[in-house]
Amino acid sequence: MKKLFASLAIAAVVAPVWAATQTVTLSVPGMTCSACPITVKKAISKVEGVSKVNVTFETREAVVTFDDAKTSVQKLTKATEDAGYPSSVKK
């Protein structure tokens, strides 16, 4: 029992170390006017774990920096889709 408790305690301390800040570029082709990036940025910014968002109308892209322990790319793309702007990871 003590070994189990010790293992869980170590895992709880080390788990945050496994989390990493990631940056992903999303393609958002549905942005058709200069006001669209504002909506996309607001939607992505509301996702927990997002630390930085830069949306560019000219390239129809959103560059997002986030904590992968708190959110995922799927949650980011869902946020843009829910705002009316489907997106995908730019290859």
Curated annotation (Swiss-Prot):
Stated role: Involved in mercury resistance. Acts as a mercury scavenger that specifically binds to a mercuric ion in the periplasm and probably passes it to the cytoplasmic mercuric reductase MerA via the mercuric transport protein MerT.
Gene Ontology molecular function, alphabetical: mercury ion binding; mercury ion transmembrane transporter activity
Membership in a protein family: Belongs to the MerP family.
Species of provenance: Serratia marcescens
Gene3D superfamilies: 3.30.70.100
Subcellular location: Periplasm
Assembly and oligomerization: Monomer.
Protein name: Mercuric transport protein periplasmic component
Lineage, uppermost ranks: Bacteria, Pseudomonadati, Pseudomonadota, Gammaproteobacteria, Enterobacterales
Database matches in InterPro entries: Heavy-metal-associated_CS, HMA_dom, HMA_dom_sf, MerP, MerP/CopZ
Keyword Metal-binding (UniProt): yes
Domain HMA: 22-88
PANTHER family for the chain: P-TYPE CATION-TRANSPORTING ATPASE
Annotated Gene Ontology cellular component terms: periplasmic space
